[in-house]
Amino acid sequence: MADEEQMERKEEATEIAPFDPTKKKKKKKVVIQDPADEVDKLAEKTEGLSVTESGEASFVGLKKKKKKLVELDPSLVEAGDGEDTLDDQVGEDEQGEGIVLGGATQYPWEGTDRDYKYDELLGRVFNILRENNPDLAGDRRRTVMRPPQVLREGTKKTVFVNFMDLCKTMHRQPEHVMMFLLAEMGTSGSLDGQQRLVIKGRFAPKNFEAILRRYINEYVICHGCKSPDTILSKENRLFFLRCEQCGSSRSVAPIKAGFVAQVGRRKAGT
């Protein structure tokens, strides 16, 4: 009994020991949890989740549940791929509404990683213009005429070699064009055996170009749509220019001969 009493006293003494301020207080270890580890743990936990047909969630451990294969309709399989039949159905609906979406243009760079080229972007701009403003981006042709070929014949004559070719390009009668050229130059001339225009005087190719531009602006180009597809006709002593593109018509001024200097000798008494 005495031994037991001594042991109890020792325990009480240890429990009521005086406070020692020199001793350091033990610090608790702070465990820093990595958020990535937490995400991995959550992913491992959620892998076992599966949704039953009744809509209730059930935990099936860590094993993944196999996905059920979707059975295709035999009618779709006989017709071909499911996507093709769906596309056909959509096309029928669109045609019924009057709006066709399947005709959208596909550009070469779509579905690839390469950069687009300047010509491709230019084509895209014109496609957008044709869709939104068909009048502005119509099939307007640009007429390019060859420059006049001029040769010298002797010292006092000039030969217009490709005169007939330019008349065919403008769709005008050679007599009308020749009358305008001679009136503007203030000289005389005629066609030779090779259908070349021989003019009296010395003229440079620039002179012919300037006169032909004035003739085209006055007797060829339509002032409304700027189209060269016009017809020059004479009605009641007046010339009318009718456009085949826009249908407009206008009267043109008759060709007036300018001042022609008389160089030859005059007869006596006149």
From Swiss-Prot:
Disulfide bonds: none
Subcellular location, record wording: Cytoplasm, Cytosol
Keyword Zinc: yes
Cross-referenced Gene3D superfamilies: 3.30.30.170
Pfam families: eIF-5_eIF-2B
Record-level GO BP terms: cytoplasmic translational initiation; formation of translation preinitiation complex
Top-rank lineage group of the source organism: Eukaryota
Alphabetical list of InterPro entries matching this protein: IF2/IF5, Transl_init_fac_IF2/IF5_dom, Transl_init_fac_IF2/IF5_N, Transl_init_fac_IF2/IF5_Zn-bd
Family: Belongs to the eIF-2-beta/eIF-5 family.
Family matches, as PANTHER family: EUKARYOTIC TRANSLATION INITIATION FACTOR, EUKARYOTIC TRANSLATION INITIATION FACTOR 2B FAMILY PROTEIN _ EIF-2B FAMILY PROTEIN
UniProt name for this protein: Eukaryotic translation initiation factor 2 subunit beta
Originating organism: Triticum aestivum (Wheat)
Source species taxonomy: Eukaryota, Viridiplantae, Streptophyta, Embryophyta, Tracheophyta
